[in-house]
């Protein structure tokens, strides 16, 4: 073969320029890599920048900030900024912010905040029950199978969806932040969630072993009730016990004092928020071949309130999604928005922009997948 040799034992093709690597990383291969790296002085400059400043800082694109202005043609009145701190409650904060918009408007307030700790308590409680019920539904599945492994991977993570918050609100309502303020564990959930995750995995183990030993479903549900009592106790210790009733006391923009006593969470929502949650649906843009547009989708074993509505998404082309969001804001209502906020974002500048960083140019590589491919892979 002209210009090439074949070593059949190592399955290596060697050519005049470069080579096709076999299944091993050999010293010869490393030498080739090092020579290629050192031959381009741009690599040395990039290495100096990234090792000193970090990849994102070194690849930040200043033009992205210059071209992104925080001035908008549609601007809705909003209260003071809320802070989820060291927790994964972004979806919950965003939904409660849409609800408090109605409270601020209806009571003529400068600002107002709903208790995120209250909804966190019941979200963790309901997710625990949802998890244990899922374990009871899958007792015949192999322990090492993909389904059980999936269920055990994160029994009650902080994350959630719009429909999950709606399920909580329909059942428990909402309360002012003063009625159930933040705690250390609500603002930094990692330690509490780790303890609950460990306990729920143990509970799953006990339920599956009891089933293997011949326990009936009724007997397993009695065990589950005792397990849920323990979960409730842990949540009370970490987050405090939710109020059954509370008093609303606020002062409006005109310095008028407002008091409403002996309210429940559901009564407060009906009276001061007043939204019909059945009128809302989550819109997504998932341009994958297995999800045709203008259809709704759900994910099995994704939820919190077992008897609640399933998590649903209506898949739309991105332009239709944008039109719907703009129309809702023009109508005077905020839009709940969820995304993979860790991608292409800069907290310092408040940017969510695919041009925020130029890591591909800095590293000399390409990121060529389209959105559908990124969702699939």
Task: Report each predicted region and the residues it spans.
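Internal, well-ordered alpha/beta segment that forms a basic, Gly-enriched binding/recognition surface
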Residues: 119-239
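Aromatic-residue-lined binding/catalytic grooves and analogous aromatic/hydrophobic interfacial grooves
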Residues: 193-303
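N-terminal amphipathic/basic membrane-interacting segments and domains
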Residues: 307-311
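Short, Lys/Arg-enriched N-terminal segments with co-localized hydrophobic residues
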Residues: 2-20
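Active-site-adjacent substructure of cysteine-protease-like catalytic cores
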Residues: 86, 151-155, 189-193, 198-203, ...
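Long, well-ordered hydrophobic secondary-structure segments characteristic of membrane-embedded
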Residues: 57-146, 151-159, 166
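Structured segments of extracytoplasmic/periplasmic soluble domains
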Residues: 93, 101-106, 168-175, 238, ...
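N-terminal regions that are enriched for targeting/export leaders
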Residues: 22-79
């Amino acid at each position: 073969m002209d210009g090439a040799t074949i070593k059949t034992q190592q399955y290596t093709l060697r050519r005049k320029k470069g080579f096709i690597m076999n299944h091993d990383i050999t010293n010869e291969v490393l030498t080739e890599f090092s020579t290629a790296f050192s031959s381009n002085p741009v690599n040395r400059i990039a290495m100096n920048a990234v090792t000193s400043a970090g990849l994102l800082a070194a690849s930040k694109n200043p033009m992205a900030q210059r071209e992104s202005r925080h001035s908008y043609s549609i601007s809705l009145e909003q209260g003071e900024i809320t802070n989820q701190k060291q927790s994964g409650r972004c979806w919950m904060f965003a939904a409660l912010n849409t609800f408090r918009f109605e409270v601020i408007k209806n009571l003529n307030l400068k600002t107002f905040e709903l208790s995120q700790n209250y909804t966190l308590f019941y979200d963790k409680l309901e997710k625990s029950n949802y998890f244990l019920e899922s374990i009871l539904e899958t007792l015949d599945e192999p322990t090492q199978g993909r389904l059980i492994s999936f269920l055990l991977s994160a029994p009650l993570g902080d994350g959630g969806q719009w429909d999950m918050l709606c399920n909580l609100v329909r059942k428990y309502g909402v309360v002012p932040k003063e009625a159930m303020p933040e705690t250390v564990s609500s603002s930094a959930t990692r330690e509490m969630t780790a303890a609950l995750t460990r306990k729920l995995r143990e509970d799953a183990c006990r339920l599956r072993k009891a089933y293997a030993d011949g326990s009936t479903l009724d007997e397993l549900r009695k065990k589950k009730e005792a397990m849920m009592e323990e979960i409730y106790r842990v949540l009370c210790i970490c987050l405090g016990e939710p109020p059954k009733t509370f008093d609303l006391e606020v002062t409006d923009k005109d310095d008028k004092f407002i008091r409403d006593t002996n309210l429940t969470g559901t009564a407060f929502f009906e009276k001061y928020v007043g939204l019909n949650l059945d009128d809302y649906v989550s819109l997504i843009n998932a341009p994958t071949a297995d999800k045709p547009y203008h259809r709704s989708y759900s994910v099995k074993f994704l939820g919190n309130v077992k008897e609640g509505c399933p998590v649903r998404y209506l898949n739309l082309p991105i332009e239709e999604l944008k039109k719907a969001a703009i129309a809702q804001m023009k109508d005077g209502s905020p839009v709940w928005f969820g995304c993979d906020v860790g991608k292409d974002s800069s907290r310092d500048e408040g940017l969510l922009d695919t041009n925020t960083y130029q890591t591909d140019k800095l590293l000399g590589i390409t990121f060529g997948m389209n959105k559908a491919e990124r969702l699939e892979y």
